[in-house]
């Protein structure tokens, strides 16, 4: 089943507007928080991802960032890592369709579980959550 959001997505109100940036950053430091961003490689050439990166850069209280990336090759993964280099928190670029991940997911087929796709942002989020949970408390 395919789901289309349309032109305007719902952004839930988490009362972030009630916080100033300093208080929000301090609160992040008190509660371990990992942010997960599913990405396609072509999004790195668009202004939105640069804005997201630049907005996250001052958040020293963020525990980590997981980028669930669909990329064609290892050079693209390295470019994504370079794009997020210098952040004040650990950044893990997870190559969702890389050879090691494909091999692992295909091996689960022996258990009669099909977890190989279909590829897309939902599939990337599913994988990224697994990566983010590795360091969860």
Predicted region positions:
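Active-site-proximal specificity loops/subdomain of glycosyltransferases
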Residues: 11-19, 74-136
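Acidic ATP/Mg2+-coordinating residue in the GHKL
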Residues: 69-72
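Broad hydrophobic/π-residue packing in well-ordered secondary structure
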Residues: 40, 65, 130-131
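N-proximal low-complexity "stem/linker" segments adjacent to membrane-targeting elements
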Residues: 1-61
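Short, surface-exposed connector motifs at secondary-structure boundaries
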Residues: 61-63, 136-137
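A structural signal for isolated positions on well-ordered beta-strands in alpha/beta enzyme cores
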Residues: 34-36, 64-66, 92
């Amino acid at each position: 089943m395919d789901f289309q959001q349309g032109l305007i997505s719902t952004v839930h109100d988490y009362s972030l507007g009630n916080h100033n940036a300093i208080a929000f950053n301090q609160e992040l430091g008190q509660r371990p928080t990992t942010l997960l961003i599913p990405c396609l490689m072509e999004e790195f050439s668009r202004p939105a991802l640069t804005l997201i990166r630049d907005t996250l850069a001052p958040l020293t209280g963020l525990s980590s960032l997981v980028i669930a990336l669909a990329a064609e090759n290892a050079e693209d993964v390295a470019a994504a890592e370079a794009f997020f280099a210098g952040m004040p928190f650990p950044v893990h670029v997870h190559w969702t369709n890389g050879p090691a991940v494909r091999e692992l997911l295909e091996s689960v087929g022996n258990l009669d579980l099909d977890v190989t796709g279909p590829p897309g942002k939902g599939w990337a989020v599913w994988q990224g959550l697994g990566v983010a949970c590795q360091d969860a408390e």
